[in-house]
């Protein structure tokens, strides 16, 4: 395992098995170091399973990008667009708090993608939706603060982590899975797709999105051709990771 590998690379430690077997505290420290390194910002990790083949008959491990760390908590966002969903099922003035996509993420997606032990490792996160999270020139309210296990990035968060603005930006471009394309995700050219943010768009019946070229834009909340790129905070101290 990873703890073993750490000690195996240290020249002075020849009897790695004996060291880790007879010193529980040392083994625990080594395991903690390995976990910390695994979840370093910029790394990719796997957690949960979701259909990714065109047929939808598979359950493939979900790959996540580590966006941020807060001590033993890690913010993850899916590497790929995993599904196609509208921001809201009806065309109406709506915020993240009331949209159908939030409900879908925290019910259907959450229960389908994660087993019980994984669900317990995912933190119920306080999600800010005030105007500071949105694009200032649009000046549209994002609604009330919510508590979510699964959420989407806001415009402010996408700007912080990916440098999102109105210009093309390869850092914020993504590919959808074959399953997501089969569900209706729009693909621009070879593979790029646009993906939803939780912030409002130019009007209250729009939602912000990241274009296929990685730029900021907005779309009608009913549009079902956008990719869903979930985000979660996980507790690295939870039993699942021990």
Residue ranges, per PLM feature:
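Short solvent-exposed coil/turn linkers within tandem alpha-helical repeat scaffolds
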Residues: 7-23
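Collagenous Gly-X-Y triple-helix signature in extracellular proteins
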Residues: 28-242
